[in-house]
Amino acid sequence: MANLRDVRLRMRAIQQTLQVTKAMNLISTAKLRKGRRVLEDTEPFFTRIQKSMYDILAAAGHPRSEFFVRTGRGGVHHSAVVAVTSDKGLAGGYNANICRRVTGLCSRLENPLLILIGSIGYRYFVNSPYLILENFSFRSRLPEVDDAKQIADYVISQYLWGMFDEVHLVYTHMYSAVKLQPAERHILPLDADTMKAELTQFDSRERAALQFEYIPSTEQVFDALVPLYIKGVIYGSLVEAYVSEQSARMTAMEESSRNAEEMLADLQLNYNRVRQAGITQEVTEIISGSAALSD
């Protein structure tokens, strides 16, 4: 049986760990709330961009744009996968789930090329058979619009240059505080029919009756809106992934705190047993010594 000193040392170590997990839980809770507020505050702007794109599609049908599905290219030769992971661990299966989803997607694509966001994703795929084109890292802070612009500009420039023929985005979607699942989204090339189906949710009946004039042309206005649209999609995915990460870390820290408290309770019982055994032994020795002196 362990002595009292060993039990006390273990209890002290677990108490220190418990303080850390509770502090990380509080920090993740605060970051989660802030991320949700930011997502709610920026959503109206990018929703407005989507509405404007619907207006153009409704008016022009299928404007000529290099962002739509290209013809005469002989199919898809290279596919880019933008994967959103984190820069820190201690978030349960958050990063592992994303990396597995990306691996599964890459296995179905022809010549996949990786654009990674987060250092953990880079460490996971650096020795994989897939080529890493670029790695972005934001040091575990709340993503900003400029971060999304940096990624969107890179993706769009490489797409227009012909480095790849299509772009997939993989991130963690937060269905609820306890349900986080990897999600895939095809962001390039655009498909007019798919966009119409998605964008008709925006008060389509009222807007269909409105007439807009686009200067200098619908094609030029549309091409100017697409980078903003893609930036909005990427930014929303970054913030949602950030919020999901904080939720996963909060859940992991709650579980760790619960386990630490259970271990402390068990150690306290063990400590009491060891202490009681020591007291019993001392009393027995005193009684035995007293009896020997009486004889």
What is each model feature region?
Residues 1-295:
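C-terminal beta-strand-loop-alpha-helix "lid" module of Rossmann-like NAD(P)-dependent dehydrogenases
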